């Protein structure tokens, strides 16, 4: 995005940011949702059946917190770098840290580990909102609403398919559900042409076919 801003100013930056944000959403949102969906069989494989119940319940919250943190760090906070607003960046990074401390003090004494998980996810959510709001003062970045909605729909259908699959347990369930989820998500995203993905795939295939036809006779 820095190169786009230097080459073509804010119009070029907007196009580059839109493309980057769309790609990020289409790639990371299903990864986070998929991780949450296979939390129990993943825990069975990683820590064994005895500890899988507790560990499986932790995975969805880790996935949510990780996704919010990634979107904030690798997209939303870039507004301050592009706008050369270092002090605002520092202030914005302090928001989730402060929120986490406050929520930990409030929730952990009452809810224990669950409270820690809730406070972590909530603090990253607060940080994302703060970065989005303050970032518009530094360098407004577009929100890829179309890709976000299409990815959300694809994730919902993926979740429905995975949740409808019987629980085989262990590595078999993990492989089956992960494969099914990836297949459903990929088909829906291609069908909706989210982020222009289907158009790009079609263009690449047509280009390869044209090259093959022009090959040695």
Tell me the role of every PLM-derived stretch.
Residues 92-101, 149-161, 209-210:
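Small-residue-rich segments of transmembrane alpha-helices in multi-pass membrane proteins
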Residues 1-94:
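Specific pore-lining/lateral-gate transmembrane helices of multi-pass inner-membrane transport
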Residues 33, 101-105, 156-171:
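Hydrophobic alpha-helical transmembrane segments in multi-pass integral membrane proteins
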Residues 38-43, 47-52, 84, 107-111, ...:
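Short helix-capping/hinge motifs at transmembrane helix termini and TM-loop junctions
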Residues 163-217:
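Membrane-proximal transmembrane or re-entrant/amphipathic helices at the cytosolic face
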Residues 6-12, 135-151, 199-204:
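Interhelical loop/hinge segments that connect adjacent transmembrane helices in multipass membrane
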Residues 19, 54-58, 116, 143, ...:
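Residue-level signature of transmembrane alpha-helical entry/exit and packing/kink sites
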Residues 57-84, 88-108, 113-135, 177-182:
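Short runs within selected transmembrane alpha-helices of multi-pass transporters and secretion channels
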């Amino acid at each position: 995005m820095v190169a786009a801003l230097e080459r073509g100013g804010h119009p070029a930056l907007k196009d580059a940011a839109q493309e980057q944000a769309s790609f990020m959403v289409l790639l990371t949102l299903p990864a986070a949702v998929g991780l949450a969906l296979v939390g129990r069989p993943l825990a069975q494989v990683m820590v064994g059946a005895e500890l899988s119940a507790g560990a499986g319940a932790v995975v969805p919250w880790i996935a949510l917190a990780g996704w919010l943190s990634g979107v904030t760090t690798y997209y939303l906070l870039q507004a301050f770098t592009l706008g050369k607003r270092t002090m605002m960046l520092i202030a914005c990074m302090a928001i989730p840290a402060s929120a986490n401390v406050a929520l930990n003090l409030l929730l952990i004494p009452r809810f224990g580990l669950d409270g820690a998980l809730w406070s972590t996810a909530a603090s990253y959510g607060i940080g994302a909102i703060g970065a989005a709001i303050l970032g518009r003062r530094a360098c407004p970045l577009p929100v890829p609403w179309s890709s976000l909605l299409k990815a959300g729909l694809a994730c919902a259908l993926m979740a429905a398919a995975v949740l409808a699959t019987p629980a085989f347990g262990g590595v078999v369930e993990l492989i089956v559900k992960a494969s099914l989820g990836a297949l459903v998500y990929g088909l829906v995203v291609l069908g909706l042409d989210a982020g222009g993905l289907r158009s790009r795939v079609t263009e690449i295939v047509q280009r390869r076919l044209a090259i093959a036809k022009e090959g040695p006779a």
